[in-house]
A protein has these predicted regions:
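Non-catalytic pre-domain segments flanking phosphatase-related domains
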Residues: 1-17, 207
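Asp-based phosphoryl-transfer active-site loop
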Residues: 11-28, 225
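Active-site phosphate-binding/coordination module
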Residues: 30-128
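Residue-level signal for inorganic ion chemistry
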Residues: 42, 76, 155, 225, ...
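Short, structured coil segments at secondary-structure junctions
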Residues: 67-68, 76, 170-174, 227-228, ...
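Conserved acidic, metal-coordinating active-site core of Asp-based
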Residues: 104, 108-215, 219-227, 236
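Asp-based, Mg2+/Mn2+-dependent phosphohydrolase catalytic module
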Residues: 208, 227, 231-250
Length: 250
């Protein structure tokens, strides 16, 4: 760690971690034995901890819950709770936009998922969908009309079109897609991101971006790396993340 980074590190008062391929291996669920020690040491130094994930709070596995983070920034910043379960911030997608999105997926011939604050449902179940979603949320139910029963905070595409897929003009000024798997993208509010969610927590605490350190690996961490005082990329990170990182783990 160079002198400049050491100086910046003295200002850190809260550390946010991504979950998949940062705290745990997404394919196997393995969590290094050193992780609980890291959280314990941060607490002993008076440094707060948080999770910043595209997952819903219902998808934060028990092993991560056991680390006792102070804050949970979930669904790419759309739903935030503290460790006591108090809601710090929430931003639902307008029902009319959800309905238009579903109509668009049918026109495109692709499948979708709908994510509430504490549950998620699938439009159908296929091998392609299972390959993408089961490592994150095993055994999700099929309910294509979930939006009629719950507020929706995030949606998914399930397809094999990759970066060739784009939202229609009528939705692209309200929603955006963030690719997280070769067969799936998160569909989130246009201003929604992990960075926006972390900023809500920082504002809630009366802190500044320079007081924040983040650990991440994926494209949905890009804005977070721009926002935080110190950004740490995992060795397995996407190249675009590594380019923005202050430090890359081995």
């Amino acid at each position: 760690m160079d002198a400049k980074l050491k100086y910046k590190a003295k200002k850190i008062k809260i550390v946010f971690f991504d979950i998949d391929d940062t705290l745990r291996t997404s394919k196997t669920g393995f969590i290094p034995a050193t992780i609980p020690t890291v959280f314990k040491q941060l607490r002993e130094k008076g440094i707060l901890t948080g999770i910043a994930s595209g997952r819903g709070i219902f998808g934060v596995v028990p092993e991560i819950q056991d680390l006792k983070p102070d804050f949970f920034v979930t669904l790419n910043g759309a739903y935030i709770e503290d460790k006591k379960g108090n809601v710090i911030y929430q931003h639902q997608i307008e029902k009319s936009d959800v309905e238009e999105y579903i109509s668009w997926t049918k026109d495109e011939g692709i499948e979708y998922g709908l994510v509430g604050s504490h549950a998620a449902k699938l439009s159908t179940r296929t091998e392609l969908i299972s390959e993408a979603i089961d490592p994150i949320y095993p055994n999700l139910d099929v309910d294509p009309d979930f939006h009629e029963k719950a507020d929706i905070y995030q949606m998914w595409t399930f397809e094999d079109e990759g970066d060739d897929l784009h939202l229609p003009d009528s939705l692209s000024d309200k929603l955006r897609m963030v690719r997280w798997h070769e067969h799936s993208s998160d569909v989130v509010p246009i201003a929604g991101s992990k960075a926006a969610g972390v900023a809500k927590v920082v504002e809630h605490l009366g802190l500044k971006p320079e007081n924040v350190m983040v650990f991440g690996d994926g494209l949905n961490d890009l804005e977070l790396f721009d926002y935080a005082g110190i950004s740490i990329a995992m060795g397995v990170s996407h190249d675009k993340i590594k380019e923005k990182a202050d430090y890359i783990t081995k």
